[in-house]
Swiss-Prot record:
This is V-type proton ATPase subunit e. InterPro entries: ATPase_V0-cplx_e1/e2_su (IPR008389). Belongs to the V-ATPase e1/e2 subunit family. The keyword Membrane applies. It holds the Pfam family ATP_synt_H. GO terms for cellular component: vacuolar proton-transporting V-type ATPase, V0 domain. It comes from Cryptococcus neoformans var. neoformans serotype D (strain JEC21 / ATCC MYA-565) (Filobasidiella neoformans). One of its GO terms (biological process) is vacuolar acidification. One of its GO terms (molecular function) is proton-transporting ATPase activity, rotational mechanism. It is found in: Vacuole membrane. Residues 1-2, 57-71 are lumenal. It is a multi-pass membrane protein.
Length: 71
């Protein structure tokens, strides 16, 4: 569970995007389909990566309210 997990998933998403680029059917909407596919993959990956990294390295440490504060 580290930064390398995020990089590995990025490579997987890039491979799916590259496969989707070549699999899209030819036609007048080919550009629209490719753009939609790549934007969807990018947005979903960014949402997952930011959420994962925020949980991995939180800015504010969680505190328990039932503990006594010590000096």
């Amino acid at each position: 569970m580290s930064f390398f997990h995020v990089v590995f998933v990025a490579f997987v998403i890039a491979a799916i995007g590259a496969a989707g680029w070549f699999v899209t059917p030819k036609g007048k909407n080919q550009t629209l389909l490719r753009t939609s596919l790549l934007l969807t993959l990018t947005c979903c990956y960014l949402m997952w990566a930011i959420t994962y990294l925020c949980q991995l390295h939180p800015l504010i440490t969680p505190r328990r309210s039932d503990l006594r504060m010590e000096y």
